[in-house]
Amino acid sequence: MAASLVSPAADAARIAELTASAHAVLDEAIEKHVLADKRRVAGIVILFSGGNDSTTLAHLFKDRATHAAHANTGIGIEQTRQYVRDTCTSWGLPLIEKYPEEGATYRDLVLGRVRARTGANAGTVLWPGGFPGPASHWMMYQRLKERALEKVRNDLVSNPYRERVVFLAGRRADESGRRKGLADRGPIERRGSTVWVSPLTNWTKLDLNAYRRVHPDVPRNEVSDLLHMSGECLCGAFAHSGELDEIAEWFPETAAEIRALEEEVRASGVAPPERCKWGWGAGKQRPSRVGDLCSSCDARFDALRGEAA
């Protein structure tokens, strides 16, 4: 890694300013969307994917947060999950780890087994089976991450008319074109009894690097260093060509699980041959809505499309 040309004093001044601003965003969110509405803070939760950027967010707010939360998608690299657990333990930060519901796992989705349980569409297959491409990312996000966060909220908010939970997310404006649209809405957004706060909206990658220089105790996730993504979700919707081979080089057990699932999907006959291959989309389709927690995959997808343009 090349040495920084910025002086330690300049780094320290910049990070002090950014840190104060980030905490001010959280203060504003609590004041405007909790206290002003005569609600109580049920929890301040860091959404911790295990990536190096989310680790910086977690380090920044670990002394103010009541919990960290991790969506165990069931289709990710176990080393990242363990990294999240170990990091939270070392900081004394309670971790809430949530999983997909039984019968609605990633495996169930790609095998076409997930059906609506309630409402007018009860019994209807929600996903026909096969692996997702970019246009189907939103379905995977809803099932593997969004519902996990709903469980976190429900754990902490006992009375939504009196309490609100604050989710701290690591969304940044410079990550990608689509996620910049999310950031343009502002760093604070209330959705029902959940207040979403993105304190790093205006941070750049250089700022994140500077934070680590000022705070050398911030840990690193080996998975992120090797794959340039956290690896907590390998749904494959935003996978690039050759990604599974890259995963196999460093984490062969994970790649073997995905390849075994490919064979299972192929044998089931639920999907056309093209969709029996993990990561088949590789930028072929226009992506659908982007999830609040899908930062690294989304940014990498944009970068790869830019290279191909």
Tell where the protein language model's regions lie, with residue ranges.
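Nucleotide-activated chemistry modules centered on ATP-dependent adenylation/adenylyltransferase
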Residues: 1-309
